[in-house]
Amino acid sequence: MNEPTINTGPEDASTIESLIAIAVGNTRTQIGSFLRAESTSHASVDSDDTESIVRMVRDRMVGFQGVSDPVIAIAGVHPSVIDEVQSSFNPGAVIRLGVDLPIDIQHTLTESGERTVGQDRLLCAIGAFHLFKQACVVVDAGTAITADFIDGEGVFHGGAIMPGVGMMLESMHEKTVALPSLKYERIDPESNDPGKQTESAMLLGVTASACGAVRWLTERYAEFFDGYPKVVATGGDLGIFEDDELVESFVPDLQLVGLRVACERAMQLDDGNEE
């Protein structure tokens, strides 16, 4: 396993000198580089394309030559892809969160929920609280859409999981005779017209489903929290919410930020430096 270089910065906050973070999703994998906690690159590739994932990681390793020996950390919801990426490097070269290092976050999940919660949800929660230091609803729009609640102390309370817009469109096509196969396109934000043809009606419907669900859930969480949380969007389909005034912040690499913070937090725990 790589031995990380830890820098101590302002307010005694420790950061890894350099990190290559890999977040493996159901459909897409994000790869990011961090130098002293600052993001220096962010890209994504199909999760099935493990050769490209490995190549992109190796390219980033070369980019750090002469700077420091980077920590390489991987997490996600696609175990077979994670296994293949890990096996492409020397044993111990790639740290696997949840196995080699814990994902440390306070939560109120049940025992079953703790066992089955997706790493992507936990990492996005860690990333959101790290960035905003307040109660948040984190909306991750990908193959599925999740809307999770983190309170003002950074405690993860769980949330909701629903089909992503692509899954909705695919399901309508596959489960009916007449509805066509469509790729998601953003609807015109300046128009309040009903859908005038089947395709536009389907796009309007899935947009309303996603945006309406997030609004309903946010109101539910606000009542639970007795205060209105900040709404943060991430994920490959975050563009769904670009015209929704409810969503205050868009952070495409939120999961990578959370992965970095979780990695640093776990290493500090290993070193006995955590307060």
Listing of model-derived features with the role each one plays in the protein:
Residues 38-84, 166, 204:
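N-terminal phosphate-binding loop and adjacent alpha-helix
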Residues 66-78, 95-97, 225-236:
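Short glycine-rich phosphate-binding loop at a beta-alpha junction
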Residues 2-39, 128, 134-156, 172, ...:
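Gly/Thr-rich phosphate-binding beta-strand-loop-beta motif of the actin/hexokinase/Hsp70
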